[in-house]
């Protein structure tokens, strides 16, 4: 509109500090013009020879795994390899996510109950059972669907109250379903006898689980860098937490592991939890090739962290 020139928009720093100035956010121009590359954009620009990953995921919420047959998937077009838990263990990994248990006085778990790839049991809908690496995402997804998983289905608990009921089956072997308890902090006891029954109300309330519904898919990629380090790029907003959470599980010492935060779209907190980091890291170590993994929206909704529901009485 002629109100400003291009030169007027350029930040001109005076002094040694930008505190209290109109310093322009470094990503502003790219975001406004649509030229800011996010993780899924970076995945499209990976070098020739990059393998695209897809997951074989659980279609039930709770089950014992009786067998995993990858034969058909391994013979499908474009497939380079199918990775299961036994491959992670053969590569020196524990195949366990480290939950970094805090407040151990209140916790009844050591934090190692979650596998990177399920091999004995399914704990939730969408649990990863195998990773397929192929020349295209389409080939990888088709082969992931061809992995045959024989299961013994177990009772599914679709809310916390059902899961902690006295007769509920244990979900994680050796870990009580109500695995964390903390003190109830409240004021002094009230003399309810002084209030007529007609004036007393008991309320049971519930706040639902809230998916973050981010538009950018959960995505990441990895490679072995020039120093020989396993390098994972993701939307992590807890890099300092996610490295120790996955290192032992994939068999990579911390000093040989690097996680880089991609330019991220909205995460709204869901990427405080690791989602794809261990899967990508394990694939890079085993395959020794650059890889990428991009979720679709169904996977975003069913297999990433959520704001937890709450029950109150």
Residue ranges and their predicted role:
Residues 1-175:
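Flexible, low-hydrophobicity surface segments
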Residues 10, 16-21, 182-186, 206-207, ...:
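Non-catalytic, substrate/partner-engaging modules appended to enzymatic cores
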Residues 36, 189-250, 301, 308-309:
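Conserved beta-alpha junction segments in alpha/beta enzyme cores
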Residues 55-89, 131-151, 219-287:
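Alpha-helical support elements that line or immediately flank enzyme active sites
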């Amino acid at each position: 509109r002629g109100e400003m020139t291009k030169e007027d928009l350029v930040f001109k720093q005076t002094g040694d500090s930008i505190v209290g100035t109109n310093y322009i956010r470094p990503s502003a121009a790219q975001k406004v013009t649509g030229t800011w590359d996010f993780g899924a954009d970076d995945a499209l620009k990976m070098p020739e020879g990059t393998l695209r990953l897809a997951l074989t995921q659980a279609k039930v919420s709770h089950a014992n795994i009786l067998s995993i047959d990858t034969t058909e998937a391994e013979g499908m077009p474009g497939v380079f390899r199918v990775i299961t838990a036994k491959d992670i263990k053969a590569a020196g990994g524990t195949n366990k996510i480290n939950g970094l248990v805090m407040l151990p006085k209140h916790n009844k778990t050591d934090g190692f109950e979650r596998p990177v790839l399920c091999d004995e049991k399914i704990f939730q809908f969408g649990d990863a059972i195998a990773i397929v690496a192929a020349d295209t995402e389409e080939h990888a997804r088709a082969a992931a669907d061809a992995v045959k998983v024989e299961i013994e289905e177990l009772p599914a608990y679709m809310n916390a109250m059902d899961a902690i009921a006295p007769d509920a089956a244990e979900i994680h072997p050796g870990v009580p379903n109500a695995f964390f308890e903390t003190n109830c902090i409240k004021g002094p006891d009230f003399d309810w006898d002084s209030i007529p029954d007609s004036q007393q109300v008991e309320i049971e309330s519930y706040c639902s689980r809230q998916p973050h519904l981010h538009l950018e898919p959960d995505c990441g990629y990895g490679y072995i860098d020039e120093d020989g380090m396993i390098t994972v790029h993701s939307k992590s907003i807890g890099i300092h937490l996610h490295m120790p959470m996955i290192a032992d599980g994939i068999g990579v010492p911390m000093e040989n592991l690097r996680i880089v935060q991609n330019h991220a779209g909205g995460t709204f907190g869901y990427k405080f939890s690791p989602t794809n980091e261990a899967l990508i890291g394990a694939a890079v170590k085993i395959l020794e090739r650059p890889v990428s993994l991009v979720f679709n929206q169904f996977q975003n909704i069913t297999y990433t962290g959520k704001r937890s529901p709450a029950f109150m009485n």
